[in-house]
């Protein structure tokens, strides 16, 4: 089951602005280590799921993984070989809008080296640059 909202008020959305930095969700709150975004962009539900699988596969169900983003924006596309006009295309998928500073994933209950490697594997699945961060007060 892909990550997507159960129901939305308006199915088709504008692309919106991606300018500015993140104002919330910028610190590690649940786990001990996190993956922070340095770029701005869209992360699809499939990318989030691929990251989750990569982290869980490396950690072998030890520790706990927290997903801090949710794809709540729909994006549409037109079929190929279609002329302009005739309305907006069908919903193609769902994305999470991320800005510099957002925490994407958090890991707890594992060592720093395990968390670093798991989050490195996850960052390879993303189209944005990221960095490894610690929760405030964690010894490193």
Swiss-Prot record:
Keyword Nucleotide-binding among record annotations: no
Ranges of compositional bias, category Basic residues: 1-17
Location of region: Disordered: 1-21
Entry-linked InterPro entries: Ribosomal_uL16, Ribosomal_uL16_bact-type, Ribosomal_uL16_CS, Ribosomal_uL16_dom, Ribosomal_uL16_sf
One Pfam short name: Ribosomal_L16
Subunit composition and interactions: Part of the 50S ribosomal subunit.
Family classification: Belongs to the universal ribosomal protein uL16 family.
Entry protein name: Large ribosomal subunit protein uL16
Record organism: Akkermansia muciniphila (strain ATCC BAA-835 / DSM 22959 / JCM 33894 / BCRC 81048 / CCUG 64013 / CIP 107961 / Muc)
Taxon lineage: Bacteria, Pseudomonadati, Verrucomicrobiota, Verrucomicrobiia, Verrucomicrobiales
């Amino acid at each position: 089951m892909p990550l997507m909202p159960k129901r939305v008020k308006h199915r088709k959305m504008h692309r919106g602005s991606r300018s500015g930095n993140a104002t919330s969700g910028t610190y590690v709150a649940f786990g001990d280590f996190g993956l922070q975004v340095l770029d701005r962009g869209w992360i699809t539900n499939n990318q989030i799921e691929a990251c989750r699988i990569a982290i869980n596969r490396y950690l072998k169900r030890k520790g706990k993984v927290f997903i801090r983003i949710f794809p709540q924006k729909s994006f549409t596309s037109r079929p190929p070989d279609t002329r302009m006009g005739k309305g907006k295309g069908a919903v193609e998928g769902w994305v999470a809008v991320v800005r510099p500073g957002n925490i994407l994933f958090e890991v707890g209950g594992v060592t720093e080296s395990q968390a670093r490697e798991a989050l490195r594997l996850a960052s390879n699945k993303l189209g944005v640059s990221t960095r490894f961060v610690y929760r405030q007060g964690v010894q490193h």
